[in-house]
């Protein structure tokens, strides 16, 4: 997920478990600030997920773009992170709190807050609630979320993801 402002996060689901990485381009832990990945962020990523750390999709011109990293193997009882000495004076030094906020708070209200900030347009909360409840899409709901689209415009996308439609 890229926000268009230089920040991103990725989640890799693999047979061994799940690998999550985030990159906050304004973080004091940015590899562009520190001339490389901040110590501890990826140092203890297990072998099962090393290919994710080294994946070119998660780098920019050879620089691994990561400020936050966690993983969970299928055998782990909880999520794991590296041992990191975070920089002082920063409330969210790696950006994890805000990078992953929609993964933690999946409420319609949280999404509307994100969407209004990101797209800089009003977003209809009732329509977002409709979608989050997986109720069948209607023309009214689609138009409330995007006046330039109709339900017919989205038919192929809706069918492709198996979302219910009227």
PLM feature segments, named:
Residues 12, 18-20, 33, 37, ...:
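Extended aliphatic helical segments
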Residues 1-18, 23:
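Amphipathic, interaction-prone secondary-structure segments
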Residues 23-81, 85:
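Compact, glycine/acidic-enriched structural inserts
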Residues 76-166:
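A eukaryote-biased signal for long
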Residues 3, 55, 139:
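Sparse, context-dependent recognition of short Cys/His-centered cofactor- or disulfide-binding micro-motifs
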């Amino acid at each position: 997920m890229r926000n268009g402002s230089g920040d991103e996060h990725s989640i890799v689901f693999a047979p061994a478990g799940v690998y999550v990485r985030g990159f906050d381009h304004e973080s004091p832990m940015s590899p562009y600030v520190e001339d490389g990945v901040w110590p501890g962020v990826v140092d203890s990523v297990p072998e099962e997920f090393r290919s994710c750390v080294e994946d070119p999709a998660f780098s920019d011109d050879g620089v691994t773009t990561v400020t936050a990293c966690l993983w969970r193997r299928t055998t782990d009882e909880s999520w794991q992170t590296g041992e990191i000495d975070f920089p002082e004076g920063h409330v969210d030094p790696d950006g994890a709190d805000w990078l992953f906020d929609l993964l933690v708070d999946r409420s319609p209200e949280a999404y509307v807050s994100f969407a209004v900030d990101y797209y800089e347009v009003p977003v209809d909360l009732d329509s977002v609630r409709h979608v989050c409840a997986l109720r069948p899409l209607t023309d009214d709901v689609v138009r409330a979320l995007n006046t330039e689209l109709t339900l017919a415009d989205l038919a192929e996308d809706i069918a492709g993801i198996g979302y219910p439609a009227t």
